[in-house]
Amino acid sequence: MPSVKLKENEPFDFALRRFKRSCEKAGVLAEVRRREFYEKPTSVRKRKAAAAVKRHAKKVQRENRKFQRLY
């Protein structure tokens, strides 16, 4: 859990902004959204497999773009 200590003579808005930034970096909101509803283990596996396929297709497309002629 991210925590922020209020510095001396620091406005609350700045501390709040630092806290929000640290929460974003820690991935707190993404984790909350992911755990908002129960997801069956089969759905988790299916989603991860689909993401892997998408990543692979993106990688192949990026590699093919290197060899494409520009004339």
Swiss-Prot record:
Keyword Protein biosynthesis attached: no
Gene Ontology terms: biological process: translation
A GO MF term: structural constituent of ribosome
Compositional bias of kind Basic and acidic residues: 60-71
Keyword field: Ribonucleoprotein, Ribosomal protein
Record's GO cellular component terms: ribonucleoprotein complex; ribosome
Gene3D superfamilies (UniProt xref): Ribosomal protein S8
InterPro entries linked: Ribosomal_bS21 (IPR001911), Ribosomal_bS21_CS (IPR018278), Ribosomal_bS21_sf (IPR038380)
Record-stated family: Belongs to the bacterial ribosomal protein bS21 family.
NCBIfam families registered for this protein in UniProt: S21p
Name the UniProt record assigns to this protein: Small ribosomal subunit protein bS21
Annotated organism of origin: Teredinibacter turnerae (strain ATCC 39867 / T7901)
